[in-house]
């Protein structure tokens, strides 16, 4: 069996700010966009979470829950510097590191000789090193598969770790809510519940054929995770699959001309970002997102070989007139999906 560690920093952005300014340590603190500009919360410290402040929450709502909240815009350079140091600590134990974001990563320590080969002790040492070298805390989950390692990292937060051994997998899964499986949101959970399926234990008694009938390919994922099967490898060279930019507006817009001007502005930023990862600007798809004042949204995409502003404007124009239904627009976003590297190489050969 493999030995997988999932390391998750504790309220990372806020923790960096509290470390660098101890006056922030015991007060409700959040990182995010201002309520005047209709921003959202990126992360919140534990004093703020006690008031119900959560990541991805509109900043205005956060202030309603916690009027005394201290809000900071964030310092991405500081967070990236800390993240790089953390990555260097991981590399002392294994080259098999799959970063998921600045503040979390999977590690495969199956072949590591450190700490006598004990994944539990390796996780403990990593957390101790992060604490002593960066004055930050991390939580960790240790399990034979990625799915359970990630769940385990949530069970002893903050500044703790949890181990699921091979012998503990089945007992652990029996009562595990299906909502813990990635991809099971509120809608899917409701459909599962209608079938009498609430826990992984319920799925274990349910025919795979029925799951496939009701949920298609995702039915197999549900069945496998509920049986403790997750064959996904750690991917050290995890490839970026998309690039996007978006802007939340200070006031809703109701006229196409304002949206068009914003898309012109966002396009320049998207092109700049894309050139950093794909100088040729070759892509697989490009698209537009509009979020309305009622928080519903529409995303429209076209298959397109190269980043193209005219096409993006046409997509946006169609979405504006077909999906808006006279609602105000509060957010506009542009994104591209990158080509699979093998496919891109083949296309270049074909074009050459």
From Swiss-Prot:
Entry note: cofactor: Binds 2 magnesium ions per subunit.
Catalysed reactions listed for this entry: DNA(n) + a 2'-deoxyribonucleoside 5'-triphosphate = DNA(n+1) + diphosphate
Subcellular location: Cytoplasm
Subunit record text: Monomer.
PANTHER family: DNA POLYMERASE KAPPA, DNA REPAIR POLYMERASE UMUC / TRANSFERASE FAMILY MEMBER
GO molecular function, one term: damaged DNA binding
Enzyme nomenclature, EC number: 2.7.7.7
Sites where the protein binds Mg(2+): 8, 103
Family: Belongs to the DNA polymerase type-Y family.
Main location class: cytoplasm
GO BP term (any one): error-prone translesion synthesis
General function of this protein: Poorly processive, error-prone DNA polymerase involved in untargeted mutagenesis. Copies undamaged DNA at stalled replication forks, which arise in vivo from mismatched or misaligned primer ends. These misaligned primers can be extended by PolIV. Exhibits no 3'-5' exonuclease (proofreading) activity. May be involved in translesional synthesis, in conjunction with the beta clamp from PolIII.
Record GO cellular component, one term: cytoplasm
Name this protein carries in UniProt: DNA polymerase IV
């Amino acid at each position: 069996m493999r030995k997988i560690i999932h390391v998750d920093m504790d309220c990372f952005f806020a923790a960096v700010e509290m470390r660098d300014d101890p006056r922030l340590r015991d007060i409700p603190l959040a990182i995010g966009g201002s309520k005047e500009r209709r921003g959202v919360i990126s992360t919140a410290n534990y004093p703020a979470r006690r008031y119900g402040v959560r990541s991805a929450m509109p900043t205005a709502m956060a202030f309603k829950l916690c009027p005394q909240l201290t809000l900071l815009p964030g310092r991405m350079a500081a967070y990236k510097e800390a993240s790089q140091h953390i990555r260097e600590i991981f590399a002392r134990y294994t080259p098999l590191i799959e970063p998921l974001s600045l503040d979390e990563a999977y590690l495969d320590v199956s072949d590591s000789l450190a700490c006598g080969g004990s994944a539990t002790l390796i996780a403990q040492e990593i957390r101790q090193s992060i604490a002593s070298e960066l004055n930050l805390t991390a939580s960790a989950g240790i399990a034979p598969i990625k799915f359970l390692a990630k769940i385990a990292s949530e069970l002893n937060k903050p500044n703790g770790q949890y181990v699921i051994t091979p012998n503990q997998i089945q007992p652990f899964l029996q009562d595990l809510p299906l909502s813990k499986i990635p991809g099971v949101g509120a809608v899917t959970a409701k459909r599962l519940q209608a079938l009498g399926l609430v826990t992984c234990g319920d799925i274990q008694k349910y025919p795979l054929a029925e799951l496939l009938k009701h949920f298609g390919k995702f039915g197999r994922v549900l069945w496998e995770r509920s049986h403790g099967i997750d064959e996904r490898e750690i991917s050290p060279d995890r490839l970026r699959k998309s690039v996007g930019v978006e802007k939340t507006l200070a006031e809703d817009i109701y006229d196409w001309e304002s949206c068009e001007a914003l898309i012109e502005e966002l396009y320049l930023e998207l092109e700049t970002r894309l050139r950093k990862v794909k100088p040729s600007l070759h892509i697989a798809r490009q698209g537009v997102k509009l979020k309305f004042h009622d928080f519903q949204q529409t995303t429209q995409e076209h298959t397109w070989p190269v980043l193209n502003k005219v096409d993006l404007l046409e997509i946006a124009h169609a979405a504006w007139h077909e999906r808006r239904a006279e609602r105000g627009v509060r957010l506009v976003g542009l994104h591209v999906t990158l080509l699979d590297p093998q496919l891109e190489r083949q296309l270049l050969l074909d074009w050459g």
